[in-house]
Each structure stands twice: as C-alpha cells, then as structure tokens.
C-alpha cells in the first residue's frame, strides 16, 4: 500500500469532496477516483459513501483515515528529524495562539527569534483556545500557547509563564458598588502602586461582571476562582475580547478579571486591584505527545522562556508555585 494513496484518502476525507481534493492535490479527478477504487478493492472495504456529489466516511473509512494520518505524521516526523540531524534548525514553524496572547506576548518574542533564526518561516494560527487544543492534538500545528488547564490527554505541556490575575474596576463610584468596594477603590487611588490594597473575591459576589464568552481558557479561570469563593459571577455582559471587557469597565458597566499582561494602567476610567490569595494563570506550550518536537520548536520554546524570565520579575510573575 502506497503512502501517497493514504494522503489522497486523507485529503478527500478532510475536504469531503473528490473535486476539491483533486484540485488541492493538483491531479485529475478521474485519476484520483481510480486510485481510491483500487485502494478499496485492495482492502476489500468501502471507505467513502458517495451520494449526489457529497462524500462521507464509512465506519471502516474513519478507522482507516485515523491510522493513515498516524502513519503520515510519523513519516513527516522522521523526515524532519533526519533533515535537522543533517542541516540543523529547520525552515518552518507553525504556532497556535489565542488572539490576546498573540497581541500582547508574541511580537517581541517573534522579533528576537527571527533575529536569531532569520531563515525560519513562522506561521501564526490565531484561533480560540478550544479550537487550538483540538488542532494541536491532530498535529495541525507544531505547538500552541494556551493557559492551564489542558484537557486533552494526547498533549504534553511545558510551562512558559505564570502571571497574576487582577481585578479591573471603574475608578468612578457606581450605584451598584457595595460601600466596602468604594472604600477600597478610594484607598487604592491614594496609595502608591506598590502598596495598593488587595480585594477579596467575595467582595464582587453581587456586582455586574463582564465575562469572556465560552471557548476561552481565561473564562474557565475566572469561573473557577469565583467557585472557590462559593459564588457564580453575575454576568452582565459577555464578550470575545478582553479589551472590550476593560472598556466596559471604564464606562462603569461592571468589573472584570484580567491577566496582568493586558492591564491598561493609562486608561483614566479603570483601576486594577490585586486579589487576595494571589490567584494566577499559567501559560504553557502545548504539543502532541509521542511526536518528534523539531529543533526549531525547541529553539523557540527555549528562547521564549529565557526572554520572559528576563522581562518579568517576581512581582510580575506572581506566585510561581500556584497553578490554576
């Protein structure tokens, strides 16, 4: 059985169309169809249901594609490893990143990496964390940067950064604010930045809360922190962007929790308060278990950890021993 035919079958399954697969593979559709018929005859099994132009996998087909993709990945891993043993750092690296991490954390890291390895072509894949976890588990990207917890047991993790979770609240007094929160904000405005008071999470139990939508790892972090204090946040708004959440806070529409890296200290409408018990979130590199981790990926992970260790001091990183 030719591995090339496995690749043909996998592409048909991926695109659910012989026509689209043939276009992508740059071969004639009749030739592609004939190759698959020969494969099915060799196996004595039907791999694809063909009906009115649509193509779906049979149960036998699903199993075949699952194993075929494992074989293709193993072949690709072997070729990459042998190439790197011969030539050193490779030429391509694909990295999955959520939008916020990509916007705030990655630009300086990429600048340093490409300055050291200018020949490497880096492909950034920006998706929501749930999609990135699935893509990484399928081997569709070399690695991703996500926040704990990681649920897929097929994935390995390497810690990158632990940072505090802070509470963003309006600077101006709002009708919905409990007196103790108002007093805490007033005290914080009077203190130096390094001496600001901490807020108990329970203090925002009944205030309007701005949450990220489903599918964001940081949303899970916030819900877990609130659950540990015995309450579910009163969600006034849900958004896909942490910047939008902070803007809503600045306009007095509620409070939100945010990773320390995204705080907007120059925003005149928002003040950031430390939270009692020093909750944190941990960013990790995520990659597929039992798969060759390229020298290129290893180099990027090592440079990133070194760079962030120099950039963030102990106060920025928070409690390094506490994972969420």
Swiss-Prot record:
The entry's keywords: DNA-binding, Transcription, Transcription regulation
Entry annotated with the keyword Transcription regulation: yes
SUPFAM superfamilies: Periplasmic binding protein-like II, Winged helix' DNA-binding domain
UniProt-listed PROSITE patterns: HTH_LYSR
Gene Ontology molecular function terms on file: DNA binding; DNA-binding transcription factor activity
Transmembrane segments: none
Location of the HTH lysR-type domain: 1-58
Residue ranges the UniProt entry marks as DNA-binding: 18-37
Name of a matching Pfam family: HTH_1
GO biological process, one term: regulation of DNA-templated transcription
GO cellular-component term (any): protein-DNA complex
Record bears the keyword Transcription: yes
Matching InterPro entries: LysR_subst-bd, Tscrpt_reg_HTH_LysR, WH-like_DNA-bd_sf, WH_DNA-bd_sf
Family: Belongs to the LysR transcriptional regulatory family.
Classification via PANTHER family: HTH-TYPE TRANSCRIPTIONAL REGULATOR CYNR, TRANSCRIPTIONAL DUAL REGULATOR HCAR-RELATED
Protein name: Uncharacterized HTH-type transcriptional regulator YcgK
Protein species of origin: Bacillus subtilis (strain 168)
